[in-house]
Amino acid sequence: MKNKRALVLLFAAHMISSFAQGITMLAIPWYFTSVVNQSELFGKVLALATVLSVFWSLYAGTLIDRYPRKNIFWFTALAGLLCMGSIAAYGSQSDQMPIALVALAFVVTFFGYNIHYPNLYAFAQELAARGDYGRVNSMIEVVGQSTSVLSGAVGAILLSGTTTGGINLMGMHVKLPFEIAQWQLWEIFMLDASTYLAAACIIPFIRYQRMAELKVDLEPIFARLKKGVRFLTANRGLLMFGLASYATFIVLLVQVMYLLPLYIDRQLLSGADVYASSEVYFALGSLCAGLFIRSLTKHMAPAKAIVILMIGAGVLFLAVSSVKSVSFFYVFSLLLGFSNAGTRIIRVTYLFDHIPNNIIGRANSIFYLYNILMRSVLLSVFSLAFFSFENNVVWAYAICGMFILAALIPMVRIMPRLKGMQVVEVE
């Protein structure tokens, strides 16, 4: 594989910065739900951030196709360092963390995700040969989910501490020969800032050779965005595939960022250890998908494999809405991780094979716009007081399951059109 060293450094920078990001995105929803008991407020913050990201994600897509992806990684790392470092410094000096600053930290990280992951995939496509796309996407999943396993385990320790001589992790009590005090939010934010710094130090050393000529559009932003729209409308089968196959990921983001802490607190009546442990199980399932999904589905059409995985995800959400069991929730998290990651690997590989690298950023922005709009609708509904009352969050899980199963209708309809699809180029 060419550009191997560049890919290793790219994955290293991604892994380091994602580690503390994962802990931050565990800590903030739990803080709103179980520490300050403001789950409805967090729902509104998340909904607002989601709506604002409509404009940001579209703009980010044009940036990814206009400027060197390496430079974008470096500048986003510096921005994360500055923002999270400043918030952490305020918390350290004042020994308090206002809710407004906690919300700001969440929005900064959330907006960072909106450019980090599309840029990561576009850069990986730029570095890899066409025949290596599936392998590289699997590597991204393995690296990302290995990091999630680690950040989930560390997050369980930092969020709850080890004052009982150990930590409850993945349903087991792990004894430790030392005590770790529960971390304050500003300390977690400072850890996050330090990993942004480490990533910013690694990125300049990435040296690579483009695997294909990258034609950069120098037109104004709206003209570049319109070209992405024209490409997808000229390839409607590809457009429908990209939208329908996003269903599991849409629901997953709503679940992880909003419903998960509510479900654990109100339905399972459990604490931060179960919250973080469920993330570890999810990451383990995703890691298994990264390792094995290509071999399991190599003789299967991409759309058919995704349909099977989506059916599994939809059934899982319906099942967990009616079963009150921590053990079953761990099984749910494990299998959902496998389904989501498997779908993402197959989906992204198919899109890499059919969308030119010089337009992938804008195409992904359009797909992500649909993602944002659907999440906004779901979050607007789930932030109603009804879903945070007692254990009514189970109804939200049932709705999520039905949303995924409904997305199967367009997926099944376009399956015949995806075989041997010829891409229509646009000027």
Predicted features along the sequence, with ranges:
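A single, central transmembrane helix in multi-pass transporters
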Residues: 166-175, 184-185, 230-290
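Helix-loop junctions on the cytosolic side of multi-pass membrane transporters
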Residues: 122, 126, 181-185, 189-219, ...
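Cytoplasmic membrane-interface "Motif A"-like loop-to-helix N-cap segments
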Residues: 66-80, 297-310, 392
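Juxtamembrane intracellular "pre-TM" segments in multi-pass secondary transporters
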Residues: 1-7, 208-243
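Transmembrane alpha-helix termini and helix-breaking/packing motifs in multi-pass membrane transporters
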Residues: 29-34, 88, 92-93, 150-189, ...
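Substrate-agnostic recognition of the 12-TM MFS/MFS-like secondary transporter fold
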Residues: 9-25, 46-64, 68-80, 100-162, ...
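C-terminal ends and interior cores of transmembrane alpha-helices
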Residues: 78-95, 311-324
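C-terminal transmembrane helical hairpin of 12-TM major facilitator-type secondary transporters
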Residues: 303-343
